[in-house]
Every structure is written in structure tokens, then in C-alpha cells.
A protein has these predicted regions:
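Hydrophobic targeting segments
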Residues: 2-6, 32, 45-48, 224
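Catalytic donor-sugar/metal-binding loop of nucleotide-sugar-dependent glycosyltransferases
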Residues: 199-212
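Conserved core of the sugar-phosphate nucleotidyltransferase
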Residues: 104-188, 206
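Extended, small-residue-rich solenoid/repeat segments and analogous flexible loops
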Residues: 216-227
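N-terminal nucleotide-binding beta1-loop-alpha1 segment
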Residues: 1-17
Length: 227
């Protein structure tokens, strides 16, 4: 059983709009609808985490089988996914997706899910010519993933890394629940980072797999109307 958990609670202040960020359009569909449509062929259930303008987001998708999860306070990506814990089946494979990344393809998600099968955990990364602003994938000498370091917390050497975290991952429900409950706000923002579960999994000797997306455009988040 596969389940999608889509983060859609962001206010999108840089969009300079009163409309919820995920409701802005690409073509004739909202950002969120693109993500839902890409995930549906390979999941059995869809959970969408909402906060800002939640009623308008729900109204946009009337008639679709979606479980709505409310995030009352925005305390980081880890906190957002924590709100979905009651709806996570321990035996399921959870696809963590973002409602403002509309160009993600079903085929990419399928490959990511397949990579997660041996260990129960895989990350989607991409190589960027200019990785400024993105979390870097930290690997050891054997190319195994060790952690993800956010831009604002990275050292000078880590900032030179071009492989970045897209935020999209596939993880077994048992692992996700375990590590979500262990999250602490040990960063400059005082938030709960979802990416911190990577380091926790490494400490548990979980061999985290990865799939490197060929196109940076496919995993690009929409932050401005012009994008």
C-alpha cells in the first residue's frame, strides 16, 4: 500500500497574493492538482496538509478522495508531516510531496518508490549548477547518504556541494512515524526539519537509497507568479 502526503499549508508570501499558494495555476490546473494527479496512479490514498486558506483549497478539489490534515501553526516541514501521523499506516510506503512542485512526473515517483523497497527509505535529489538556497546531500567516501544540511546551516565546504535535496522522499510508515516523533528544533530557525529524519535513519544503520532526477525543472518549486 502506498500513500501520498502532500504539504500544502504554506502561505506563499512571495507570491504577493491572497490566494493560497497551491491554488495558483499552471496551465488550467492548480499547482496542488498537478501534484495530486501525478501521485494518484501509484498511491492508494492521498493526504493533503493544509493551513492557509484551507477552505478554499478544499473547495478546489471537491469530489476527489482526499484526506485533509490541518496544520494550525507553521513550525517547519517536520511539524507539518507530524500532523499526518494518525493517518499513516505503519505498513505503507509514504510518498512525501510538495503542493508547489507541479511538474513532478508519475514515472519519477514510481522509480523513487522502487528504490525504497530494500531499506524502506529513498530520497529524490538533483544536481544543480547553482544550488544556492537548497539543502545539500551529504555523502561519505562510499557515496552513502549521511545527512541533509540546509543552506543556512551549511559550512563553507558543504556549500560547494551541487547535489541538492528536493524534499521529495519515499519512506516506510514505521520509519516515518518513529523519526517524526524524535524530531527536535535544533537549528537556527527553531523549526522541525523533515530532513533531520535522514540523519536519524543513518544512525539506525538504515541504508538510504536515492534517485537523481535528470531535470531540475521537474522538481522546481514555484515561489513567484512569473515562474
Amino acid at each position: 500500500m502506498n500513500t501520498a502526503i502532500i504539504l500544502g499549508a504554506g502561505q506563499g508570501t512571495r507570491m504577493n497574493s491572497n490566494i493560497a499558494k497551491v491554488l495558483h495555476k499552471v496551465g488550467n490546473k492548480s499547482l496542488l492538482q498537478h501534484v495530486i494527479d501525478s501521485s494518484k496512479p501509484i498511491v492508494d490514498s492521498v493526504n493533503v496538509i493544509v493551513g492557509h486558506n484551507s477552505n478554499s483549497v478544499k473547495n478546489e478539489t471537491i469530489g476527489q478522495e482526499i484526506n485533509w490534515v490541518q496544520q494550525k501553526e507553521q513550525l517547519g516541514t517536520g511539524h507539518a508531516v507530524q500532523q499526518a501521523i494518525p493517518y499513516i499506516d505503519e505498513g505503507s510506503l509514504c510518498l512525501i510531496l510538495y503542493g508547489d512542485v507541479p511538474l513532478i512526473k508519475t514515472q519519477t515517483l514510481q522509480k523513487l518508490a522502487s528504490r525504497a523497497e530494500p531499506s524502506g527509505f529513498s530520497l529524490l535529489s538533483v544536481m544543480m549548477e547553482n544550488p544556492y538556497g537548497y539543502g545539500r546531500i551529504i555523502r561519505d567516501s562510499k557515496n552513502s547518504i549521511l545527512s541533509i544540511v540546509e543552506q543556512k546551516d551549511a559550512s563553507k565546504d558543504e556549500l560547494q556541494i551541487r547535489e541538492i535535496n528536493t524534499g521529495i522522499m519515499a519512506i516506510k510508515g514505521t520509519l516515518l512515524i518513529k523519526y517524526l516523533k524524535e524530531l527536535e528544533p535544533n537549528n537556527s530557525q527553531g523549526e522541525l526539519y523533515l530532513t533531520d529524519i535522514v540523519e536519524k535513519a543513518v544512525k539506525d544503520n538504515v541504508n538510504i537509497a536515492s534517485f537523481i532526477c535528470e531535470s531540475p525543472t521537474e522538481v522546481m518549486g514555484i515561489n513567484h507568479k512569473t515562474q
